[in-house]
Amino acid sequence: MPHTKFLALSILFSIGMVRSPASAQTIPSPYTYIENHQELAFFVGKSNIDAGKLELGPRDSDTFGARYSVGLGGAISIDISGTLFKSTRLIQDVRRPIDDRTINRGNIDLLLFDARIRLNLTGRRMWHGFQPFLTFGGGFAFPYLVDNGAEEVAFMRSEDRYVFGVRFTGTTSGGTTFHVSRKLSLRVEGMLNLWQIKTPIGWFALENDPLRLFSESEWVTAQSIMLGASWRF
């Protein structure tokens, strides 16, 4: 009988030794928590800009910028960005025939500052290194550098010249961040900006617009694709 009890205890002990490693194993999670809550980034891209029906506004551009981000907790972050659009525009003289109004092409560089709420779709975690997101917000844009040389040479009246001015901008975007390491990450983003183009007051003179076809203003979009790198801290 003691021999039987000893044999039973030995079997139970052996089973326990076999099961212990298996019970200690854990299935690795595809999600990794992101510890750092602040981020500084630089980005470059290309922008497809709508110049408007009268083709007065800025056109396609090379785009550069910088961004500061801070996490607010959970899935929400704030992005504060400054973006430079290195663009061109068609310089038009409304006093000339409609098929001969364009007298030249000039540079126009725009600066855009905006603040956006970012919704991280995986929260404060990344999935296999990826963290997809959506953003929305607003800001303002204004010209940083404008080439008016052709207008001066053509002696265009000031009321006939297009001026971008300071414009409110609406912004939305979507993309994903790929975390290369705990602090370094890459980000690809498709962005849509919305702003208003205003027609110069001189264009509404009777001799320039006898049929009253010109609109006073028009909302246009800038569609951009951005690639950037950021450092988290």
Predicted feature descriptions by range:
Residues 25-27, 70-153, 220-233:
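Gram-negative (and chloroplast) outer-membrane scaffold detector with strong preference
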Residues 58-60, 94-101, 149-157, 203-211:
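Flexible, surface-exposed loop regions and adjacent strand-edge segments
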Residues 1-34:
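Cleavable N-terminal export/targeting peptides
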Residues 24-71, 145, 224-233:
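Short glycine/proline- and aromatic-enriched beta-strand/turn motifs that initiate or cap beta-hairpins
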